[in-house]
Amino acid sequence: RMMDGSKFDRDAWNVRFVQRNITPWFTELELRYGQSKIDHVMDTYSMRYLSMMGNQVKKAMNPKRETNTGHLKATFDWPDINLQTGIDYMRDKHLSRMEMNGEGYRHKPYQPQQNFTQWGGFVEGAWTASDSRKFISGYRYDEVKAEYDTLIANNPNKHHTYGLHSGFFRLEEEINGIKYYAGVGIAERAPDYWERGASQVLDKEQNRQIDTGLMWKIDTFDFSVSLFGSDVRDFIMLERVGKDVSARNIKATRLGGEIEGKWKFARHWEIGSSLAYTYGKNRTDDRPLAQTPPLEWKNSLTWDNETLSAGVLWRVVSAQKRYATGQGNIIGQDIGASAGFGTLSFNTGWKINKYATLQGGIDNLFNKSYAEFVSKGADPSAGLQTVRVNEPGRQYWLRLQVQF
C-alpha cells in the first residue's frame, strides 16, 4: 500500500423485517435496509520513519465512505418447487481530503471523488424432480451507474453505466448414497472504486464457469471432490511499474479443485484432510495469472464432547513459482516466487452454557518464519524496494462469544 492506516472509525446499522406464512404458497417476505460509514486516516509518518536521504514525502489522506443498501425478497413454495425473487439497491459515495508536506488535513473540506448507484433484480428457482434429482437455476440483472465527481461535466469519462447479466444452471443427483452435482454459470461485475481509480476506461468483467463434484457420506466417513474451470473475459488486472499503478482488461483462465475427507474414528474424535490447488493463466500476456495461491494441504485432529473441545491443525503450503511480477489486484501484486512452509496451530473451547462459549488457542505453535504468496506488498512511496512481508510468529488468542 502507498500509506499506512493509522486511524479508523466505522459505524453501521441494519434493520430487518420478515413476515412468514402469508399464504400456503407465499411463505416469506423479507425487507432489509442498512447504512455504513467509514472514516479513516492513512499517512506516511505515523507508523514509519521518514528518511531525509530518500524521496519520501510527509503526507496523509482522510477518505470517507457512506454506503446505503436495500434488499427486498419474496419466497414462494409449491409442491416440489421453490421460487425466490426480489430487488436490491445500493448507493455508495466516496469523499476524501489530504495533506502534503505536513500542512495538515483536518481544516480542509472533504472533496467528492466517486459515487455509485446500483439497482438489481433477481429470480432463483429450484425443482425437486424426484427424491434423488434436483434442478436449480437463476438469473440476475444489475444496472450500475458510476460517476467521477472530480471530472468536468463534459468529460466523456465522467459517467459510466454498466448493465450486468448473471445466470446459472445446476443439477444435483444422488445415486447409491453418492451426491453428484454439475453447474454452469455466467457472472458479470463492474469495476469498483479502486479499479476505476487506476483507469477510467475499464470494461465490465465477465466470468464463465463450469463446476462439478461429488459428496459421499457413509457411516463415520465423509468425502468430497470439487472441480471448476473458468474463462474470464475482460478480467480487471492492476499493474504496478515503479510508483505508478494502472488497470486494464485481459483474458484469463482459471482451473482448480479440492479434495476433502473426514473420519470419525472414535467417540468424540475426528480426523480430517484436504488438498486444494488453483491454476491461473493470463492469456493476453501469455504468463501466469497474478495472485494465484499455490498447492495447499490441511490436516486436522479434533476432539469434541459438545461441552469441551480441542484440536490441532497442520497446514502445509508448497512453493509458488508461477508469478507475474508487478501484476495483481487492489489487495496486492506479485513480487516474485515464494517458498513453501508448514505451520501447526492448537485451539480449545468450552461451551459454558447455551449462550456463551470461551475459546482460546496458539497459532504458529513453533514460531516459524514464513510468508504467504498472496499477500499485501510493501510501500514503494517510502523509497524502499518491495519485499515479501512475513506473517506473525507465535500468537496466543482468547475469545468469548455470547449470543442471546
Q: Residues of each region from the PLM?
A:
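Gram-negative outer-membrane beta-barrel transporters
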Residues: 127-136, 142-144, 222, 227-231, ...
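C-terminal beta-signal and adjacent terminal beta-strands/loops
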Residues: 231-233, 318-325, 349-404
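Residues on the lipid-exposed face of transmembrane beta-strands in outer-membrane beta-barrel proteins
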Residues: 15-19, 70-76, 121-127, 169-173, ...
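Outer-membrane beta-barrel translocator domains and adjoining extracellular loop/strand segments
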Residues: 1-3, 41-50, 55, 95-104, ...
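Transmembrane beta-strands of outer-membrane beta-barrel pores
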Residues: 35-39, 78-80, 89-95, 141-147, ...
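Face-selective signature of the C-terminal outer-membrane beta-barrel domain
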Residues: 9-174, 179-183, 221-227, 270-272
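Membrane-embedded beta-barrel scaffold of Gram-negative outer-membrane proteins
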Residues: 25-46, 172-189, 204-257, 262-264, ...
